[in-house]
């Protein structure tokens, strides 16, 4: 999965898919009442990027729906996975459940079209703080209450705070999550970070005893880091330059070992070599 980083406008979505992304990461900011408000990152952000792109969340969802609905004039067949980077740091811990509820209602109406031929992409809810795990509970219970529990088949999870993996596992136990787990690891492209935690996450994924199904590394912009990430056997690379990821995947060392995921690849299934 080649995950276009910080895609917060519909024009950027077209741009990143055009460069080779089959997945995008979108930042979601919340208002004081825990309503998802804008797709917006703000300052500071990755080096070499403009931090200010912003779209009303529901408008973004409508555009995303068109981009992921076969037959629509705006349809991108390649775009199969969306990571919502939920900026819940602005919320009190006790608002996490409400944020999950409101997020589910927004997605149900504007992305899934109330279950009537909505967008087909898989969705990852990426939460920065472990103690906001009730967002997951609120999200799930809302879809169940609305009669659309089936849509949870399209939803996965990530905690993005680089916490200890055993703590992440405990938090998922509390949230009642048993699958559909991606584990992120990374840092802004302005700084360097080693691969030790990525390797620990991959080991958890491959042990058959852990909760992790997939691992992605962010933000990977350099050719050398891209190769290191692939050598560590990650499932996803989040990048500002998807064309570089495509270029490296075409190198002799990688083209027989890796391929770009399609809609037929289940993002919640651990790949077995």
UniProtKB/Swiss-Prot annotation:
Signal peptide: none
Tissue specificity statement from the Swiss-Prot or TrEMBL entry: Expressed by the venom gland.
Residues binding Mg(2+), per UniProt: 25, 27, 85
Taxonomy, superkingdom: Eukaryota
InterPro entries: PLC-like_Pdiesterase_TIM-brl (IPR017946)
Disulfide bonds: 45-51, 47-190
Enzyme Commission number(s): 4.6.1.-
Cofactor info, note text: Binds 1 Mg(2+) ion per subunit.
Record GO biological process: killing of cells of another organism; lipid catabolic process
Gene Ontology CC: one annotated term: extracellular region
Cofactors named for this entry: Mg(2+)
Annotated GO MF terms: lyase activity; metal ion binding; phosphoric diester hydrolase activity; toxin activity
Active-site residues annotated for this sequence: 5, 41 (nucleophile)
Compartments where found: Secreted
The reaction(s) this protein catalyses: an N-(acyl)-sphingosylphosphocholine = an N-(acyl)-sphingosyl-1,3-cyclic phosphate + choline; an N-(acyl)-sphingosylphosphoethanolamine = an N-(acyl)-sphingosyl-1,3-cyclic phosphate + ethanolamine; a 1-acyl-sn-glycero-3-phosphocholine = a 1-acyl-sn-glycero-2,3-cyclic phosphate + choline; a 1-acyl-sn-glycero-3-phosphoethanolamine = a 1-acyl-sn-glycero-2,3-cyclic phosphate + ethanolamine
Keyword terms, alphabetized: Cytolysis, Dermonecrotic toxin, Disulfide bond, Hemolysis, Lipid degradation, Lipid metabolism, Lyase, Magnesium, Metal-binding, Secreted, Toxin
Function: Dermonecrotic toxins cleave the phosphodiester linkage between the phosphate and headgroup of certain phospholipids (sphingolipid and lysolipid substrates), forming an alcohol (often choline) and a cyclic phosphate. This toxin acts on sphingomyelin (SM). It may also act on ceramide phosphoethanolamine (CPE), lysophosphatidylcholine (LPC) and lysophosphatidylethanolamine (LPE), but not on lysophosphatidylserine (LPS), and lysophosphatidylglycerol (LPG). It acts by transphosphatidylation, releasing exclusively cyclic phosphate products as second products.
Name recorded for this polypeptide: Dermonecrotic toxin LvSicTox-alphaIC1ai
Provenance organism: Loxosceles variegata
Phylogenetic lineage: Eukaryota, Metazoa, Ecdysozoa, Arthropoda, Chelicerata
């Amino acid at each position: 999965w080649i995950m276009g980083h910080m895609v917060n406008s519909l024009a950027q979505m077209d741009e990143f898919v055009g460069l080779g992304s089959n997945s995008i990461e979108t930042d979601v900011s919340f208002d004081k009442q825990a309503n998802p408000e804008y797709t917006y990152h703000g300052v500071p952000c990755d080096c070499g990027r403009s931090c200010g792109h912003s779209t009303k969340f529901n408008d973004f969802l409508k555009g995303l729906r068109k981009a992921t609905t076969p037959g629509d004039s705006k349809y991108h067949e390649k775009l199969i996975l969306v990571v919502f980077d939920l900026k819940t740091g602005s919320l009190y811990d006790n608002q996490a459940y409400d944020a999950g509820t409101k997020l589910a209602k927004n997605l149900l109406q504007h992305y899934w079209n109330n279950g009537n031929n909505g967008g087909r992409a898989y969705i990852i809810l990426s939460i920065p703080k472990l103690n906001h795990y009730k967002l997951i509970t609120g999200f799930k219970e809302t879809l169940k209450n609305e009669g659309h529990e089936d849509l949870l088949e399209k939803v996965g999870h990530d905690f993005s705070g680089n916490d200890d993996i055993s703590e992440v596992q405990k938090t998922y136990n509390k949230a009642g999550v048993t699958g559909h787990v991606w584990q992120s690891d990374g840092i802004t492209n302005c700084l360097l970070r080693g691969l030790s935690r990525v390797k620990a996450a991959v080991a958890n994924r491959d042990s058959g005893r852990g909760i992790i199904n997939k691992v992605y590394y962010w933000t990977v912009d350099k050719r050398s880091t891209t190769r290191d990430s692939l050598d560590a056997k990650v499932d996803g690379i989040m990048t500002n330059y998807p064309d570089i990821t495509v270029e490296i995947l075409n190198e002799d060392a990688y083209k027989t070992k890796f391929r770009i995921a399609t809609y037929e690849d289940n993002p919640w299934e651990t790949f077995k070599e």
